[in-house]
């Protein structure tokens, strides 16, 4: 049939058609026959287009999963934060699909030979500060460059020109008109960029001296504020047939009409996402759907498009909202319903924790355009701010936001000679439409080995030793320790200070902010944004800073605690509804308020032309509108009492919820007792009132912003007046709940009518001398306790004295013990000593007031709580109690509640114990207004360097973060007992706006940015420390555990 004689047609067997492998060693071919071409191929050659437009070839087995290819790409790029990225390709319908890691590639891509996959950013974080590596930020900048060119990142022409100018600065260095114009002729950044050419050049002139890393950061900072940042449209229509676009982001599912966002379904509102054929369904929580129907329906183009969008939503939700990946469900034996698709990478939380906890070593890299042109400042004036990496080992850490990232520059950049470039001919191809340059992947590989055997493959964290490279003298100037940036450095004993206390470490959480690593930061920045001198600007800035902290506090409940209870299915549905239906609306409101304040402050700090407009130098209109809206939330605030009560009851009834609750309180993100965060919404209202009073006091009645601020103050005062009694009741309930958990040996501490008055450390006279005890004064009784087993957070009840019939007398002369007084109770008499005369006066005043109140209360006093430990036989009323037992005896008795050997030691109870002081109910109430957040510079102890930290002051404690986006603090410093003052001449501090914190031998210096912020920090710290009182060391005849502890801390600090 037309076949040439002597040849044979090869017939496919059933096994060949099904893809079965031919047995090796036995040939079934006739002489002269060969295998089919597709049978000869043992590997697929996949082309991947990287973000710098270079092409790479990857060889993989045909049946391997997508993860194999992804792993090869990450390895070749040396990309550590790989979970932000993915591989995308176009299907036959020409829309982009993400390569699935857990699915075979040949089941996803029909013709792998003809498909070009491209590396792309998959998850866009809300803030570039969350990206840990400089290399990751560089890749993100390249992604935004691609989005600009493909018109995905739509924005105003001026903004597009500004972004392009920063990209130019990053790629070719400082402004040079001839070079700029030539570069822009060859490289396209914007569609029709000729129209914006002059504006791009004008902006580029202003970036002189800006390093590539700083330029990348500026690109990300500008882009993240745009509406279309990270948005990928999926065409759809609603039930009425209106054409819309769906998208997904870190906050939830978004709905657009054109380029206008018309709705946002936040993750906290969404109960379930599903699809059925072409219909995409969003099921809302019953308590939040409001005027909407329970389930919203959108129609996409096809089933595949619908399923693709659903998968992206699942991945975004898991990555940004969950603490870790959900456990895979067991497969059905016979039938399965629905998709088995799950996100298979690390969550953002896991990724950030991995970097913070693992001490990753950063690998240097080289930019694609680094050989074109280099900023002069990068080579000379600001060497520490721009890290220059030589293959021979010269490396200096620096970055706009990450001190551990590295930027590499090849020696050919410094010596523009005719040296040949390396070329990876084995695995690098060039797209005909792509400039032929060496990819960062190849450059990172070559950079790792170019130095030969003497070159270290990876530098340790911290300041590496500067090693001379070729052509560099060993006498080259080295950056001083104070001119290098670093993360917050802690001594080894306090490396994880906010999680559970480690066994063997000091129980007092007093961070030693040391110079470990030798890294510092010179606070003299060469360029500053324009800062208005008006005090109102700094008040608004305080509103913004404290609002950011407040939102983070709310997220402890709305995001982190919700995730914990949902994951374990530990909370009853009724309590879930009660809790989150009261917190979520408040959280959403404050998110919008924060956005408004951020935008207004950005205009306030903006260029002088925009700044001359009076509308930008005001905040009253925003405050008035939002303070009035807060009135509508009064009913939510009023139910927080019920929420707190029901949560406490549920934890007692449900052991699973109790376990999740306790476990969650040990997490770093829960830096205060969990129920404390339920008080934050009402406490925040008092803070608004305080700041509005400051604004009104600053403005004259004729000021254009005075009227709005005055009306806003009036509105918020009405709300706080209504809620004042609720806050008092809430604070008391929260404190009793906290004590019930931490005190062992007492039942039913929470009772109607019982009020907390004071807690603190006194020394009780026993036969063995003065023994340290923790005392708790309530409206009807006085408890005293001893510290439980070492390493636990519990105090064991040692005695309960009713206030009825109690008498308190001074007894300094009788016992020859300073600051002592005697407490006569109905069945017992004890002698106690305070640390100072001030402490003694506070205790005696509160005791006498409480005794008088209990006497006048009569029969209305609550029943005394029961004891769960054996009590001693009653003594004669005239007998003075001289206890036989000591702290060693106390360790012999241990309750089952003390099973949790880990605890958080920055609560007021533990700080009072170790600082030998006390705190009253009035002090706690005053601390509500003494809250502050903002950036401070902390001075290193052993150098002249300063380190920029985000600092939060709340609950008598300073919490330190690297940036305001961090989810949990790196360290904390309880301030009870500390004094705050201005440095003396002997301290050698020659800077403005510096204040000094001191407790015994522990001294810290912090520097504020302005006179106003300096005075505010001094005010709030003085208000907290003076109200609670400072406690110098006590002269004792007996043991002094607190002194020994401070000595241990001091020894570690030195």
From Swiss-Prot:
Leader sequence residues: none
Coiled-coil regions listed in the entry: none
Domain FERM: 44-324
Chain ranges of the PH domain: 755-852, 929-1026
Pfam families named in the record: FA, FERM_C, FERM_M, FERM_N, PH, RhoGEF
BP GO terms, sorted: actin cytoskeleton organization; cell adhesion; hair cycle process; neuron remodeling; osteoclast differentiation; podosome assembly; Rac protein signal transduction; regulation of integrin activation
The entry's keywords: Guanine-nucleotide releasing factor, Phosphoprotein, Repeat
Residue ranges with Low complexity bias: 468-492
Region (Disordered): 421-527, 856-894, 1029-1054
Alphabetical list of CDD domains matching this protein: FERM_B-lobe (cd14473), FERM_C_FARP1-like (cd13193), FERM_F1_FARP2 (cd17190), PH1_FARP1-like (cd01220), PH2_FARP1-like (cd13235), RhoGEF (cd00160)
Domain notes for this protein: Intramolecular interaction between the DH domain and the PH domains can stabilize the protein in an autoinhibited conformation.
Function, in words: Functions as a guanine nucleotide exchange factor that activates RAC1. May have relatively low activity. Plays a role in the response to class 3 semaphorins and remodeling of the actin cytoskeleton. Plays a role in TNFSF11-mediated osteoclast differentiation, especially in podosome rearrangement and reorganization of the actin cytoskeleton. Regulates the activation of ITGB3, integrin signaling and cell adhesion.
Protein's name in the database: FERM, ARHGEF and pleckstrin domain-containing protein 2
Organism: Homo sapiens (Human)
Recorded name of the encoding gene: FARP2
């Amino acid at each position: 049939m037309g076949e040439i004689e002597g040849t044979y047609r090869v017939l496919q067997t059933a096994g060949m058609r099904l893809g079965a492998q031919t047995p090796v060693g036995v040939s079934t071919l006739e002489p002269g026959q060969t295998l089919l071409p597709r049978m000869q191929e043992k590997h697929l050659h996949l082309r991947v287009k990287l973000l710098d437009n270079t092409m790479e070839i990857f060889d993989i087995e045909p049946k391997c999963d997508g993860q194999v290819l992804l792993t090869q790409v990450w390895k070749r790029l040396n990309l550590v934060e790989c979970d932000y990225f993915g591989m995308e390709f176009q299907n036959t319908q020409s829309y982009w699909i993400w390569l699935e890691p857990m699915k075979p590639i040949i089941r996803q891509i029909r013709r792998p030979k003809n498909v070009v996959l491209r590396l792309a950013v998959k998850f866009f974080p809300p803030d570039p500060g969350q990206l840990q590596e400089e290399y990751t930020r560089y890749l993100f900048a390249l992604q935004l460059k691609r989005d600009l060119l493909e018109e995905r990142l739509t924005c105003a022409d001026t903004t597009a020109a500004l972004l392009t100018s920063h990209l130019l600065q990053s790629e070719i260095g400082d402004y040079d008109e001839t070079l700029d114009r030539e570069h822009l002729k060859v490289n396209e950044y914007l569609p029709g960029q000729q129209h914006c050419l002059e504006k791009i050049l004008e902006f580029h002139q202003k970036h002189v001296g800006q390093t590539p890393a700083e330029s990348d950061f500026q690109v990300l900072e500008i882009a993240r504020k745009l509406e279309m940042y990270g948005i990928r449209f999926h065409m759809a229509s609603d039930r009425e047939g209106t054409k819309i676009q769906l998208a997904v982001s870190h906050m939830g599912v978004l709905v657009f009409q054109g380029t206008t966002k018309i709705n946002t379904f936040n993750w906290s509102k969404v109960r379930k996402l599903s699809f059925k054929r072409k219909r995409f369904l969003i099921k809302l929580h019953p308590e939040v759907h409001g005027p909407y129907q329970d389930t919203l329906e959108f129609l996409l183009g096809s089933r595949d498009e619908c399923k693709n969008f659903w998968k992206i939503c699942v991945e975004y939700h898991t990555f940004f909202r969950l603490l870790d990946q959900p456990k895979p469900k067991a497969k059905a034996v016979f039938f399965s319903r629905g998709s088995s698709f799950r996100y298979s990478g690390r969550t953002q939380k896991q990724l950030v924790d991995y970097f913070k906890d693992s001490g990753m070593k950063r690998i240097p890299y080289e930019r694609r355009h680094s050989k074109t042109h280099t900023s002069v400042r990068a080579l000379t004036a600001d060497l520490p701010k721009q890290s220059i990496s030589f293959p021979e080992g010269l490396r200096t850490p620096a970055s706009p936001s990450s001190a551990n990232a590295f930027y590499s520059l090849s020696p050919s950049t410094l010596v523009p000679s005719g040296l040949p470039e390396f070329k990876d001919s084995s695995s690098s191809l060039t797209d005909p439409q792509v400039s032929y340059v060496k990819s960062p992947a190849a450059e990172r590989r070559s950079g790792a080995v170019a130095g030969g055997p003497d070159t270290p493959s990876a530098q340790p964290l911290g300041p590496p030793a500067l090693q001379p490279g070729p052509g560099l003298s060993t006498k080259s100037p080295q950056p001083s320790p104070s001119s290098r940036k670093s993360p917050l450095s802690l001594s080894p004993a306090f490396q994880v200070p906010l999680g559970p206390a480690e066994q063997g470490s000091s129980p007092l959480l007093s961070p030693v902010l040391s110079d470990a690593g030798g890294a510092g930061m010179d606070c003299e920045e060469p360029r500053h944004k324009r800062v208005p001198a008006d005090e109102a600007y700094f008040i608004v800035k305080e509103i913004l800073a404290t609002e950011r902290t407040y939102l983070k506090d709310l997220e402890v409940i709305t995001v982190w605690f919700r995730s914990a209870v949902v994951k374990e299915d530990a909370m009853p549905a009724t309590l879930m509804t009660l809790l989150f239906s009261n917190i979520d609306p408040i959280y959403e409101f404050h998110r919008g308020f924060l956005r408004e304040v951020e935008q207004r402050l950005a205009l306030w700090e903006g260029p002088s032309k925009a700044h001359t407009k009076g509308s930008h130098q005001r905040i009253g209109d925003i405050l008035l509108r939002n303070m009035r809206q807060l009135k509508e939330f009064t009913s939510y605030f009023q139910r927080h009492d019920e929420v707190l009560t029901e949560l406490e009851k549920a934890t007692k009834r449900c052991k699973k919820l109790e376990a999740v609750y306790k476990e969650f309180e040990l997490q770093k993100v829960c830096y205060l007792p969990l129920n404390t965060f339920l008080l934050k919404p009402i406490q925040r209202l008092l803070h608004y009132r305080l700041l509005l009073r400051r604004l009104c006091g600053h403005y004259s009645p004729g000021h254009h912003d005075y009227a709005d601020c005055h009306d806003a103050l009036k509105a918020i005062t009405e709300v706080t007046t209504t809620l004042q009694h609720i806050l008092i009741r809430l604070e008391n309930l929260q404190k009793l709940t906290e004590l019930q958990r931490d005190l062992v040996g007492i039942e039913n501490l929470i009772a109607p009518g019982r009020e907390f008055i004071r807690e603190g450390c006194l020394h009780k006279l026993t036969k063995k001398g003065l023994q340290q005890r923790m005392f708790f004064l309530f409206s009807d009784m006085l408890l005293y306790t001893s510290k439980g087993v070492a390493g636990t957070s519990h105090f064991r009840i040692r005695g309960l004295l009713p206030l009825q019939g109690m008498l308190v007398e001074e007894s300094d002369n009788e016992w020859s013990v300073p600051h002592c007084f005697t407490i006569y109770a109905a069945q017992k008499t004890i002698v106690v000593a305070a640390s100072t005369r001030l402490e003694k006066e506070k205790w005696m005043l509160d005791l006498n007031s409480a005794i008088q109140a209990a006497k006048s209360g009569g029969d209305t006093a609550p029943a005394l709580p029961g004891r769960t430990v054996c009590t001693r036989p009653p003594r004669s009323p005239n007998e003075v109690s001289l206890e036989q037992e000591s702290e060693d005896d106390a360790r012999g008795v241990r309750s089952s509640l003390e099973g949790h050997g880990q605890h958080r030691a920055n609560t007021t109870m533990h700080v009072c114990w170790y600082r030998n002081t006390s705190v009253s109910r009035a002090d706690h109430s005053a601390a509500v207004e003494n809250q502050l957040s903002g950036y401070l510079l902390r001075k290193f102890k052993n150098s002249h360097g300063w380190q920029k930290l985000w600092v939060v002051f709340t609950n008598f404690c300073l919490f330190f973060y690297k940036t305001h986006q961090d989810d949990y603090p790196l360290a904390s410093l309880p301030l009870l007992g500390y004094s705050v003052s201005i440095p003396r001449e002997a301290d050698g501090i020659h800077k403005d706006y510096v204040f000094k914190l001191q407790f015994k031998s522990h001294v810290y210096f912090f520097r504020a940015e302005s006179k106003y912020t300096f005075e505010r920090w001094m005010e709030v710290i003085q208000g907290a420390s003076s109200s609670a009182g400072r406690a110098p060391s006590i002269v004792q005849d007996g043991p002094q555990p607190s002194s020994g502890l401070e000595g241990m801390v001091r020894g570690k600090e030195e």
